Amino acid sequence: MAGAAMAERGRVPPPAPAPSTEGLPRAFLQSLRTLFDILDDRRRGCVHLREIESRWQGTDARELPRGVLEGLRQVAPASGYLTFERFVAGLRTSLLSADGGPRDPTRAPARPGDQPPPPPQRLVFAPADEPRTVLERKPLPLGVRAPLAGPSAAARSPEQLCAPAEAAPCPAEPERSQSAALEPSSSADAGAVACRALEADSGDARRAPRARGERRRHTIASGVDCGLLKQMKELEQEKEVLLQGLEMMARGRDWYQQQLQRVQERQRRLGQSRASADFGAAGSPRPLGRLLPKVQEVARCLGELLAAACASRALPPSSSGPPCPALTSTSPPVWQQQTILMLKEQNRLLTQEVTEKSERITQLEQEKSALIKQLFEARALSQQDGGPLDSTFI
């Protein structure tokens, strides 16, 4: 006997069983998985206890049920990181302690004439394959399978409904046997209290049942929508692009004004000194030079951008944006008018240059004729003075 006692003392105690999610309905586990994924924003597979406490102990978490954080602290390991199984086990522990706590010892005993209290009610979970998952309280005799939630389940009291309107898709799991549907009432009550805790965190009013195929929007306790955050980010990017374009347009406007002043000054100087060889020569430099094709390309791109913006804005009839500038087919754009005016000015300058050259050629022809006439007259006078023997051949 002493040897057996020593053997019992030296035996290592068996390790504590790992937390499991057995005994909870699939739809409830899916809801908890969604909540755990929101808390695990870094996708590490575990969440530290301090992160949960910092999120659930703020000013917006005043309606948090008592014992939730204590239950999570009980199941948390030494490192403080909670996996999904430990997270579910902590919620189950806290909800069981809140639902099945010690009774009031000062309660009076039942009198002989009083009716006996009604039998305890159990939670019946509809399978996750139904369009809506409903929790209803009804007596469940042993050995009888839980009936499916029918149309009458939607007419029950609000306290008996605690499930999303549509079962979210979940990863493939092995089918449970029929005996898994009959669990102890403690785990069923834990599922109901956990549902009420999740509804208290959300703080939203109950909505109408969603249509099949409509996407659910998962929000944190603060009520910030992920889709709204995405839209705000896209609008911020569009704002940055528009501000950059506006800055480039302002700089381009200054450059256009400088070039326009240079062209006007050059026109004025050419008008004052028409006979100057410096400005009237064919090889005189142009104000823009090689930049002229690029300037025309920029003007064309801006015209296409405005035309596309006006076309897209004219499609919706109820557009509240500012009216776009009128771009009619009868009047050409401004950049085309500027190009036409520039070509006309160049044509005028070339015509003027050709006229001046023609006048100069005519003047030189006249001078040549006068010189030839003077030469013939001089030869005639020399022949008369020199006699018949002197002859000059031209």
From Swiss-Prot:
Compartments (UniProt record): Cytoplasm; Nucleus; Cytoplasm, Cell cortex; Apical cell membrane
GO cellular component assignments: apical cortex; apical junction complex; apical plasma membrane; bicellular tight junction; cytosol; nucleolus; nucleoplasm
The protein's gene is named SAPCD2
Quaternary structure and partners: Interacts with a spindle orientation complex at least composed of GNAI1, GPSM2 and NUMA1. Interacts with GPSM2 (via TPR motifs); this interaction is required to prevent GPSM2 anchoring at the mitotic apical cortex and is inhibited in presence of NUMA1 in a dose dependent manner. Interacts with PARD3.
The record, for InterPro entries, names: Suppressor_APCD_1/2
Q: Name the coiled-coil region(s).
A: 227-277, 336-384
Tissue specificity here reads:
Expressed in 5-month-old fetal tissues, including stomach, intestine, colon, liver, brain, lung, heart, spleen and kidney. Undetectable in non-cancerous adult tissues. Expressed in many primary gastric carcinoma, but almost not in adjacent normal mucosa. Expressed preferentially in M and G1 phases, compared to S and G2 phases. Expression is up-regulated in hepatocellular carcinoma (HCC) and colorectal cancer (CRC) tissues (at protein level).
Q: Could you tell me where the Polar residues compositional bias lies?
A: 177-188
Annotated organism of origin? Homo sapiens
Where are the Phosphothreonine residues found in this chain? 219
Where Phosphoserine occurs, the residues are 284
Q: Which UniProt keywords apply?
A: Cell cycle, Cell division, Cell junction, Cell membrane, Coiled coil, Cytoplasm, Membrane, Mitosis, Nucleus, Phosphoprotein, Tight junction
Region Disordered, residue ranges: 1-23, 95-125, 150-188
Gene Ontology biological-process annotations:
establishment of mitotic spindle orientation; negative regulation of protein localization to cell cortex; positive regulation of cell population proliferation; regulation of establishment of planar polarity; symmetric cell division
Q: What is this protein called?
A: Suppressor APC domain-containing protein 2
Q: Which is a Pfam family this sequence falls into?
A: Suppressor_APC
Tell me which domain of life the UniProt entry assigns to the organism this sequence originates from: Eukaryota
Q: What does this protein do?
A: Plays a role in planar mitotic spindle orientation in retinal progenitor cells (RPCs) and promotes the production of symmetric terminal divisions. Negatively regulates the mitotic apical cortex localization of GPSM2. Involved also in positive regulation of cell proliferation and tumor cell growth.
